[in-house]
Amino acid sequence: MKLSHLDEKNHPKMVDVSDKNITSRIATASGMIYMSQEAFDVIKNNTAKKGPVLQTAIIAAIMGAKKTSEIIPMCHPLMLSKVETNIVEFVKECAFKLIVTVKCEGKTGVEMEALSGVSIGLLTIYDMIKAIDKSMRITDIVLESKEGGKSGKFVRS
């Protein structure tokens, strides 16, 4: 399989998407963060010294999606039309699941934007609570689904 990010001399390059059609692109990614009961309670009770953790993580996830092309070298800058977040609590596991959906009308997909949003959002939770629990675990950052483009639809089973 030939990698699209390498030229004929195996040097890295940004893929030329100028001949692609503009289509609707949407991708959803998710990830988990597990923590101690104390850290979970601080977040749930909104008593973290650094401020509202989940609200800040949502803003960070949106910013992370928007800034993807600045931190991942071969990603194209995209005009995003939507970044939507959802946080699900797992009380028994002392965990939160962050879900990020990104949409645009463009020539390339938004999978990396969704994955970046999840990563930055979860890292923000870690940053804001690390004084309480340095053993938090960020896991299972995955692409859940994507639509649009020549590769078609993908849904994680």
UniProtKB/Swiss-Prot annotation:
Name the Gene3D superfamilies for this protein.
Answer: Molybdopterin cofactor biosynthesis C (MoaC) domain
Q: Where does substrate bind?
A: 74-76, 112-113
Reactions catalysed, semicolon-separated, are:
(8S)-3',8-cyclo-7,8-dihydroguanosine 5'-triphosphate = cyclic pyranopterin phosphate + diphosphate
One Gene Ontology term of the molecular function aspect:
cyclic pyranopterin monophosphate synthase activity
Give the superkingdom in one word.
Bacteria
Associated pathway: Cofactor biosynthesis; molybdopterin biosynthesis
Q: Which InterPro entries does the protein's record reference?
A: MoaC, MoaC_bact/euk, MoaC_sf, MoCo_biosynth_MoaA/MoaC, Mopterin_CF_biosynth-C_dom
List the active site.
127
Keywords linked to the UniProt accession: Lyase, Molybdenum cofactor biosynthesis
Q: Under which EC number(s) is this enzyme classified?
A: 4.6.1.17
Question: Top-level EC class, please?
Answer: lyase
Q: Name one Pfam family in it.
A: MoaC
- A GO biological-process term: Mo-molybdopterin cofactor biosynthetic process
PANTHER family associated with the record: MOLYBDENUM COFACTOR BIOSYNTHESIS PROTEIN 1, MOLYBDOPTERIN COFACTOR SYNTHESIS PROTEIN A
Per the record, the similarity remark reads: Belongs to the MoaC family.
Summarize the subunit comment: Homohexamer; trimer of dimers.
Protein purpose: Catalyzes the conversion of (8S)-3',8-cyclo-7,8-dihydroguanosine 5'-triphosphate to cyclic pyranopterin monophosphate (cPMP).
From the Swiss-Prot or TrEMBL record, give the protein name: Cyclic pyranopterin monophosphate synthase
Q: Tell me what organism the protein belongs to.
A: Campylobacter jejuni (strain RM1221)
* Lineage of origin: Bacteria, Pseudomonadati, Campylobacterota, Epsilonproteobacteria, Campylobacterales
